Amino acid sequence: MSLNAETKAKIVADFSRGTNDTGSPEVQVALLTAQINHLQGHFSVHSKDHHGRRGLLRMVSQRRKLLDYLKRKDDARYKDLISKLGLRR
C-alpha cells in the first residue's frame, strides 16, 4: 500500500523547494495525497478493510494538519500547493 521509489522521487522532485528537500510541508502533503489517492482505489475493491481505513484516516488527518500549518505560515505557498494538487475544489 505504499508508493514505489520512482513515484516518490518524482513527487519529491516536483514539489521540493531545494535540491535535497524532502521534509518541507509541500513535499509531505504531496506524498500523503498520492498515498491517499492510492488507498482510495484499494477501498473501492476491499470495502471491509477496516484496519487499512484507520490508516487512511490517519493520513488524511496528518495532511490536514500540515495544510493548516502551511496556511498559517505562508498563505501564498498554501494556495499554490492546493492548486497543484487539485484539492479544495
UniProtKB/Swiss-Prot annotation:
Biological-process GO terms, alphabetical:
translation
Keywords of the record, alphabetical order, are: Ribonucleoprotein, Ribosomal protein, RNA-binding, rRNA-binding
Question: An example Gene Ontology cellular component term from the record?
Answer: cytosolic small ribosomal subunit
Translocase in keyword set: no
Q: Return the SMART domains for the record.
A: Ribosomal_S15
- What does the annotation say about its assembly with partners? Part of the 30S ribosomal subunit. Forms a bridge to the 50S subunit in the 70S ribosome, contacting the 23S rRNA.
Family the entry assigns: Belongs to the universal ribosomal protein uS15 family.
Q: What is this protein called?
A: Small ribosomal subunit protein uS15
Species of origin: Tolumonas auensis (strain DSM 9187 / NBRC 110442 / TA 4)
